[in-house]
């Protein structure tokens, strides 16, 4: 099989790669391969059963068109201070420009026009003052809340846009390997159900996301492709009554707080705060389960949940952050300890 451009993974990176090619007037044949399902057929059985069913071969919350974004809290963080090391790679001004551009696309596809955390300046000032008094930094981060259910509608509209503009999307297709010739990628090897075949392309984009990070790391090692370990965030998800977080919820919707507590002074931050939200389980490879938070526009609980994360960066000789995180996640001793800390 031949195409001009093949994209591995239909998460946000893969989706926006295809979309940007279209918006720039590309006439090339684009093939988007995704091992999960289309957005309209992705269903988590927990809604009916009330408990996680450990779906195989993959979790429908993490895998499928739009990745985990379709079932997450549905928030866009509109600040270059949030979201990784991209400002260090391409510059803060460029990142801010790209954030505004990406945000405009979400608005085109139906995102809520309201932005949280920017209207009550005096109240924000008071929250920042209280944060400073406790040794924390409050990050200025406007939030556009799509809502878990609205995010699915938006990604469905994007899926249909890609299809109507000629992008071929194949679901249930797992990329098992790259095809290299003279150190140049000329295609990918694909498994689709019981069938296996090769796709040859002029350009190959690998956008495997968090779900495919371990696979991509091993793929790079197998072919001698230069790559660097990223930051690993390990922590707990805490759930409290809405009344405790009422001021922060009403003023900011989500507070982005950073601290460097003693004795180790590692970076610790809050992440993914969900007022009136719901804690959810996500399953990855090797029987690793993690927790996330969902936040609907209309459906609300009596609790607020958020993650508290400690960031780790790894260098030689130990540069296997994914394996490190998996070992921590699988350790019963660590799990028991973390759960006891969460309950305090």
Predicted features along the sequence, with ranges:
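Dinucleotide-binding Rossmann-like beta1-alpha1 core, especially the glycine-rich loop
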Residues: 64-117
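Residues forming the flavin
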Residues: 1-83, 122-336, 343
């Amino acid at each position: 099989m031949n195409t001009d451009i093949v994209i591995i993974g239909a998460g946000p990176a893969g989706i926006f790669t295809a979309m940007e090619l279209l918006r720039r007037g590309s006439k090339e044949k684009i093939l988007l391969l995704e091992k999960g399902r289309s957005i309209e057929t992705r269903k988590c059985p927990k809604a009916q059963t009330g408990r996680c069913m450990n779906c195989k071969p993959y979790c429908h919350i993490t895998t499928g068109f739009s990745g985990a974004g379709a079932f997450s809290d549905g928030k866009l963080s509109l600040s270059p201070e949030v979201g990784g090391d991209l400002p260090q790679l391409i510059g803060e001004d460029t990142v801010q420009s790209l954030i505004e551009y990406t945000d405009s696309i979400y608005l085109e596809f139906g995102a809520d026009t309201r932005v949280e955390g920017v209207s009550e300046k005096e109240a924000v000032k008071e929250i920042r003052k209280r944060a400073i008094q406790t040794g924390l930094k409050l990050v200025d981060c406007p939030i556009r809340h799509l809502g878990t259910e609205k995010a699915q509608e938006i990604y469905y509209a994007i899926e249909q846009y890609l299809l109507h503009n000629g992008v071929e999307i194949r679901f249930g297709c797992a990329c098992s390997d790259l095809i290299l010739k003279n150190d140049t990628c000329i295609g990918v090897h694909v498994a689709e159900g019981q069938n296996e075949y090769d796709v040859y392309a002029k350009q190959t984009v690998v956008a495997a996301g968090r779900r495919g990070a371990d696979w991509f790391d091993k793929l790079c090692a197998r072919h001698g492709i230069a790559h660097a370990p990223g930051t690993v965030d390990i922590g707990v998800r805490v759930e409290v009554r809405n009344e405790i977080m009422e001021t922060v919820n009403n003023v900011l919707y989500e507070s982005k707080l950073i601290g460097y507590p003693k004795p180790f002074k590692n970076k610790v931050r809050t992440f993914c705060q969900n007022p009136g939200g719901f804690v959810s389980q996500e399953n990855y490879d090797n029987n690793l389960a993690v927790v996330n938070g969902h936040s609907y526009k209309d459906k609300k609980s009596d609790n607020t949940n958020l993650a508290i994360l400690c960031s780790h960066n790894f260098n030689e000789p130990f540069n296997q952050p994914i394996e490190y995180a998996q070992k921590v996640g699988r350790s019963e001793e660590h799990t028991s300890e973390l759960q006891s800390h969460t309950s305090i």
